[in-house]
Amino acid sequence: MERLELVVASSIGADLAMAFLTGTKQPIGHVFFDGGQFAQIAKGTGRVMTPFLYIAIKSLYWSKGGTLKKILWCDDDSIKLYFIAASENLTYTNLRRQILDSLEDKPFPSLPEELQKHIYFEFGSIEDHFKYRQAVIEAYPCGNYPVFEGYDHMQYQIRDPKGFAEMLTYIAAHDGMPKLPFIRK
């Protein structure tokens, strides 16, 4: 493989993508991050919240998805089975490691200015994580920061996966965001 044209990362999986981006010698064309993964918490907070989050996530399996709306902003049938399966397979140890590794309040890793110009950090205007947008802008001043007006965390990709895929294709082909009615800069 000579080049990766597009790297896409959402939620906590973005930490893996960021580790890849900071460690690879592979040329990267474009990167799209869903903004929610940039939440940062103190280590102690992560330790305290892990058992509660574990029970909340496991409840998705125990209730056959009945608690999804209480945990996430939506309970679409299209995603319910995914969350049920994920919660069934979740272990406490894996969740603890993921929280402690992913949401730690530490400086964002540095990225080359040229790569930043081709990175898109999307935030939904009504998601809780929107408050972290300014910190990401300060860490990566050359990046692109579209706001999905009226959208919550990952809502566009869940509600319109085809439209989301077309948007990503456009980014890779045209080095920019398509004109979508809900996007503001």
Residues covered by each model-derived region:
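Gly/Ala-rich beta-loop-alpha elbow adjacent to hydrolase catalytic centers
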Residues: 8-17
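Catalytic histidine neighborhood in serine/cysteine hydrolases
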Residues: 140-154
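Conserved acidic catalytic loop of the alpha/beta-hydrolase fold
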Residues: 1-5
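Conserved alpha/beta-hydrolase catalytic His-Asp/Glu region
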Residues: 43-44, 60-113
